[in-house]
Swiss-Prot record:
The keyword Transport does not apply. The record marks 36 as: Aromatic residue of the functional dyad. It holds the Pfam family Toxin_2. Belongs to the short scorpion toxin superfamily. Potassium channel inhibitor family. Alpha-KTx 04 subfamily. GO terms for cellular component: extracellular region. GO terms for molecular function: ion channel inhibitor activity; potassium channel regulator activity; toxin activity. The record marks 27 as: Basic residue of the functional dyad. Blocks reversibly Shaker B potassium-channels. This is Potassium channel toxin alpha-KTx 4.3. It is found in: Secreted. Expressed by the venom gland. Coiled coil: none annotated. InterPro entries: Scorpion_toxin-like_sf, Scorpion_toxinS_K_inh.
Length: 37
């Protein structure tokens, strides 16, 4: 699941993913966060 959060590194996506999908799992792809559900 891509969320509308800009990133430069995967670490930035973990708290954003936790807030968005309830799971702190994801990575930074093409400057945007991708979360795993």
């Amino acid at each position: 699941v891509f969320i509308n959060v800009k990133c430069t590194g995967s670490k930035q996506c973990l708290p954003a993913c936790k807030a968005a999908v309830g799971k702190a799992a994801g990575k930074c792809m093409n400057g945007k966060c991708k979360c795993y559900t």
